[in-house]
């Protein structure tokens, strides 16, 4: 599945959807963001059953600030509307695949039971 672009108006609904949503918060001026974009797009092709989305942190500065993003790229992963991963920096392709497998295997009932309130935002 192709990567979609999210903005402030559609972000909340997109990440609240059932299933797994990976979000790359990126900026065009960051070399690391540009490098991770290729990795992220390739992962999207390998996992067409998942939703891959990007947020342009320059164009959506208010959204990036609301999410607590302080550096790009930052990868955020939601499952069934729950933020289960958020880290700054880029991952190689095999690490993205391992992360996808880990998120697929999560026992979401246990996650929600242990963390009934959303975790504080802390991406870099």
Language model: regions and residue ranges:
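Short active-site neighborhood of thiol/selenol oxidoreductases, capturing the structured segment around
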Residues: 16-30
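Conserved phosphotransfer microenvironments
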Residues: 33
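CheY-like receiver
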Residues: 13-14, 63-66, 99, 108-124
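Structural alpha/beta surface segment adjacent to cysteine/selenocysteine redox centers
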Residues: 63-72, 78-80, 84
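A short beta-strand-turn-helix
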Residues: 3-20
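Non-catalytic, surface beta->alpha helical segment in thiol-disulfide oxidoreductase systems
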Residues: 79-112
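Thiol-based oxidoreductase modules, predominantly thioredoxin-like and allied folds used
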Residues: 3-7, 25-27, 37-62, 72
């Amino acid at each position: 599945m192709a990567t979609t672009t999210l903005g402030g108006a559609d972000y909340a609904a997109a990440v609240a959807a059932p299933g797994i949503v990976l979000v790359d918060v990126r900026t065009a001026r960051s070399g690391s963001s540009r490098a991770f974009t290729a990795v992220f797009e390739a992962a999207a092709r390998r996992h067409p059953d998942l939703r891959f989305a990007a947020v342009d942190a320059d164009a959506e500065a208010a959204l990036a600030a609301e999410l607590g993003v302080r550096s790009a790229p930052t990868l955020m992963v939601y499952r069934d509307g729950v933020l289960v991963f958020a880290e700054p920096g880029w991952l190689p392709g095999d690490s993205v695949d391992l992360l996808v497998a880990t998120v697929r295997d999560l026992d979401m009932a246990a996650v929600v039971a242990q963390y009934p309130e959303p975790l504080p935002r802390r991406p870099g």
